[in-house]
Amino acid sequence: MQQKLIMKPSMSQTLLTRFTFNIPDIEGLFPGFKAGDFAVLYGPQSLNSLASILCVRAQLPANLGGLESNVVFIDCANSSSLSDIQFQLDAKDPLERVLNMRVYTAYRLTSLIMEKLQDAVENQDAKLVVISDIACPFLYDNVNDQEAKTVYSQIMSYLANFAKKHHIIIIATYLTHESSRRNSVLQEITTAKANTVLRFTKTLYTKEVELEKHPTYMLGVVDLTTENHALTEFMGTDKAEQNCFLM
């Protein structure tokens, strides 16, 4: 008598699932994030709208391209608002499964990431952490240059290791701060620590996405040829956000 073996998906198979932008132009270059990634997205302020949409899409079932997961969202220096979303889900509110934590200083960001992030991820059972404008508190806060460089580097290392250890995806946006004298130094640190780096650029005539760094994907540049709502402004309500304000 023959026995039929029913094979359950292994953890390694589960972790190979790709979490995409759901933007065809980008997917041809970058097939998606996977568990263990610490990714950085460089670009203009509008990039935070894209990050917000990723927070919403992560809640979708896997067969719709989501992670079936809650999300931890860290808003640095009030650079973004999850209420700027006009997006429909089969849920009462697309933000009800997002823990929104806001920080305004380098000290509070350091404390949140190093001391409180693990509890937040475990309590939320989150598979995705999104950090908006991650360098901002260190670029403009009243911290001396050497301390800012040292502590920021520690945070980047911690996030890279945290993503691998807990098998989650961490995506940080790094907005344009060309006027800050620390900007180039912190960008170098960020690029060195992240395993995935994407740069979004916009001119009067073109919109481009460049994959600057990835452990396995081929690097390159792609034009954004279609209209994508994720790169425009959104309107919505913040009633269901879970807010933690860390001054």
Would you name each region that the model predicts?
Residues 1-91:
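The Walker A/P-loop phosphate-binding site
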Residues 24, 33-52, 80, 146, ...:
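Localized chelating/binding microdomains
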Residues 36-37, 68, 95-98, 166, ...:
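Short, well-ordered alpha-helix to beta-strand connector turns
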Residues 39-41, 72-74, 99-101, 171, ...:
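Hydrophobic/aromatic beta-strand patches that form the interior of the parallel beta-sheet core
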Residues 52-56, 110-114, 152-157:
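Short, hydrophobic/amphipathic alpha-helical packing segments
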Residues 71-141:
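Conserved inter-motif catalytic segment of the P-loop NTP-binding fold
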Residues 120-192:
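P-loop NTPase motor core
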Residues 161-247:
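Phosphate-binding/switch region of NTP-binding enzymes
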